[in-house]
């Protein structure tokens, strides 16, 4: 039976009902999607905060966190350089739990006993053995208290008491001192929270007359002269809170030399210094910087001043000629120039202002710009916590303004980034190609972090074909030891040698490195370096592999026929070293031993037959010579590419590198594939 046809009105009514139902259904779907979105947001935000932000460093001086995947990093940088050669390639089959069969022991396995440090009068090391015995006994006690939790409880009690008595330290917006106040403080003005962009320091002073020096540091005595007249002073921004017990880094060294410079003319010299290693000096000698030379915030590095000689450069001669012709043609010079004298004069008051710009420091004297010095890698404004003024100068007053009013922390451990990205991989079951033992001090938190973030990211280290560990003794400060233990437990790359640390006993860490590399890992090669040494891992391993496997080897920057210094800071007494010459020895910042030599060193130590000397690198040379003479011939391989002082192009190791320079060296190596130095101004 055929259905009756619907009228137009009925059809419209049905269509309206359909549209209404469709709208309701759309609203319901939209509400469901919105509810689902809210649920996702609710669960996702805590996850992001928990996993993402927790891995970010709170240290404003550190670089951004590395990408989670090295593969992602490679994709981002692929146009510049494929990173297969340096960075570890992640495998999809790998899981976080894989390879956890062996974990690094925090405490060294090197065996100490009461007989270990019995002094021997035969080799002149009586005093060294005595101090080693005391250091071991004290260190053992410190470690026991650290393990039991006594140290942590004592520290919490001390901290609470300190806050009750003194409150928390605050940062001042400005600091001012009179000349007499500065003198009372040992010519040091503390800058509580360092400097920041826009900070400025004003010094009002008067240079003194020249005095005679028989041993001048800035010039050489002429033949027949007994002394030279010198007048100079130094303003230095120093990192007073960098590492306790060490020379503070000189973040800026400003040295006006009125008289006595080797050039015979007044100059202003500027530089930086880290661990007694000076950079390349910037000297202003009265000539204006060239037009094609880089500027600092638009200012030239050196302004011109009147010189008392008639020597002029070719550029100046041509400039004068052009000005003369311009004057003849137009009738007047293009611009009026004033030639100022050298900004400092004996017994004449001056006002010097040092300001921190975007690209560097700017120095003006009596309102006139004199010189600008660009910031250097590894030296930052925040770390400049002290101003020192020394030399031939009478200071009337010092004022520092626009200082930062807050700083996150000056504790050394602020540099630690507790991220799993930097944790050491587990020890492999198979033999490793090379073990690298890194000498470090307890409070060198920044140095260790820089090593983790730089050359320890090499694919050979991440894949455990090369294993690297820090070797640290116990510190005199309780809080350092507490933080050190936490660091060791988290990163898994620290081996603590249980004795109280001192420079003369560094040799014990070296023996511990040999024990770990030869016994714990059975590594083919054992390398020793310092925590301010950058290691080009693949090149160093290739250098070691050049020697046939059945040969004993000793590789490094080897010194021959060196004699002991009998005077000065590094002096050695005849009781300590009676011989006239040292044995051939490789410089301490980086050298390699074969496994058999390392085993010999440990064996002699455990039998209490190992002769020890306070200079660690000389000690190793002495042990290698003993092995060479009595056990098996050794191949001595000398290479200047194990750089002792600073960095050279095509280095194998670079020494005296600050934490930021370490990161810079790694970035250059990753991006270019070539060992290039940083800070080569």
From Swiss-Prot:
Record-linked SUPFAM superfamilies: Concanavalin A-like lectins/glucanases (SSF49899)
Broad class of the protein's primary localization: Golgi
Gene3D superfamilies hit by this protein: 2.60.120.200, 3.90.550.50
Topological type in the membrane: Single-pass type II membrane protein
Tissues in which the protein is found: Expressed in junveile leaves and stems, and at lower levels in cauline leaves and siliques.
Gene Ontology MF: a single term: hydroxyproline O-galactosyltransferase activity
Disruption phenotype: Reduced levels of arabinogalactan proteins. Root hair defects. Reduced seed sets. Reduced seed coat mucilage. Increased sensitivity to salt stress. Premature senescence.
Cofactor requirements of the protein: Mn(2+)
Taxonomy, superkingdom: Eukaryota
Pathway in which the depicted protein is active: Protein modification; protein glycosylation
Basic and acidic residues bias spans: 62-78
Localization: Golgi apparatus membrane
Record domain Galectin: where: 187-401
Lumenal-side segments: 50-681
E.C. designation(s): 2.4.1.-
Residue ranges, Cytoplasmic side: 1-28
Glycosylation sites: 629
Entry-linked InterPro entries: ConA-like_dom_sf, Galectin_CRD, Glyco_trans_31
Protein name, entry field: Hydroxyproline O-galactosyltransferase GALT6
Lineage: Eukaryota, Viridiplantae, Streptophyta, Embryophyta, Tracheophyta
Gene name in the database record: GALT6
């Amino acid at each position: 039976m055929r259905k009756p046809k619907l009228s137009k009105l009925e059809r419209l009514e049905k269509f309206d009902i359909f549209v209404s139902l469709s709208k309701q259904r759309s609203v319901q779907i939209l509400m469901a999607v919105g509810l689902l979105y809210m649920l996702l947001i609710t669960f996702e935000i805590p996850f992001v905060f928990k996993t993402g932000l927790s891995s970010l460093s709170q240290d404003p001086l550190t670089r951004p966190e590395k990408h989670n995947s090295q593969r992602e990093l490679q994709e981002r940088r692929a146009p510049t350089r494929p990173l297969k050669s340096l960075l570890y390639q992640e495998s999809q089959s790998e899981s976080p739990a894989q390879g956890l069969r062996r974990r690094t022991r925090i405490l060294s396995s090197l065996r100490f006993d009461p007989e270990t440090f019995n002094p021997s009068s035969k080799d002149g090391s009586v005093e060294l053995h005595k101090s080693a015995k005391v250091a071991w006994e004290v260190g053992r006690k410190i470690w026991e208290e650290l393990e039991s939790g006594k140290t942590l409880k004592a520290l919490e009690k001390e901290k609470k008491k300190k806050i009750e008595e003194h409150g928390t330290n605050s940062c001042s917006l400005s600091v001012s001192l009179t000349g007499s106040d500065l003198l009372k403080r040992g010519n040091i003005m503390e800058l509580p929270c360092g400097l920041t962009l826009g900070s400025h320091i004003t010094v009002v002073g008067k240079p003194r007359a020249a005095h005679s020096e028989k041993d001048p540091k800035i010039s050489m005595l002429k033949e027949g002269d007994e002394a030279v007249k010198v007048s100079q002073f130094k303003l230095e921004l120093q990192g007073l809170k960098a590492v306790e017990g060490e020379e503070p880094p000189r973040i800026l060294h400003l040295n006006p030399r009125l008289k006595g410079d080797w050039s015979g003319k007044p100059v202003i010299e500027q530089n930086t210094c880290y661990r007694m290693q000076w950079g390349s000096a910037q000297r202003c000698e009265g000539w204006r910087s060239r037009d094609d030379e880089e500027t600092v915030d638009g200012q030239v590095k050196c302004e011109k001043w009147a010189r008392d000689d008639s020597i002029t450069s070719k550029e100046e001669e041509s400039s004068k000629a052009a000005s003369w012709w311009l004057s003849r043609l137009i009738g007047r010079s293009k611009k009026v120039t004033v030639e100022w004298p050298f900004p400092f004069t004996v017994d004449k008051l001056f006002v010097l202002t040092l300001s921190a710009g975007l690209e560097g420091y700017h120095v003006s004297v009596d309102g006139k710009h004199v010189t600008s010095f660009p910031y250097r890698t590894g030296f930052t404004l925040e770390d400049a916590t002290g101003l020192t003024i020394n030399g031939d100068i009478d200071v009337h007053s010092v004022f520092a303004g626009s200082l930062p009013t807050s700083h996150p922390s000056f504790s050394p451990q602020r540099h630690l980034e507790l991220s799993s990205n930097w944790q050491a991989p587990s020890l492999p079951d198979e033999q490793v190609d090379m073990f690298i033992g890194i000498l470090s001090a307890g409070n060198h938190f920044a140095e260790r972090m820089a090593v983790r973030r730089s050359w320890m990211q090499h694919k050979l280290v991440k894949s455990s074909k090369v294993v690297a560990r820090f070797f640290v003794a116990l510190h005199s400060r309780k809080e350092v030891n507490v933080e050190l233990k936490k660091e060791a437990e988290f990163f898994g790359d620290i081996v603590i040698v249980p004795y109280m640390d001192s420079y003369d006993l560094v040799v014990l860490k070296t023996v511990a490195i040999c024990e770990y590399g030869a016994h714990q890992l059975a590594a083919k090669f054992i390398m020793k370096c310092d925590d301010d040494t950058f290691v080009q891992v693949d090149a160093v391993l290739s250098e070691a592999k050049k020697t046939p496997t059945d040969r004993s080897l000793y590789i490094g920057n080897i010194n021959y026929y060196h004699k002991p210094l009998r005077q000065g800071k590094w002096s050695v007494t005849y009781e300590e070293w009676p011989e006239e010459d040292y044995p051939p020895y490789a410089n301490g910042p980086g050298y390699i031993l074969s496994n058999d030599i390392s085993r010999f060193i440990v064996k002699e130590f455990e039998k209490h037959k190992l002769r020890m000397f306070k200079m660690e690198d000389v000690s190793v040379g002495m042990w290698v010579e003993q092995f060479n003479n009595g056990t098996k011939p050794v191949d001595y391989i000398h290479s200047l590419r194990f750089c002792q002082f600073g960095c050279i192009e095509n280095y194998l190791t670079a020494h005296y590198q600050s934490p930021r320079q370490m990161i810079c060296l790694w970035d250059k190596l990753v991006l270019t594939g070539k060992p290039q130095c940083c800070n080569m101004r």
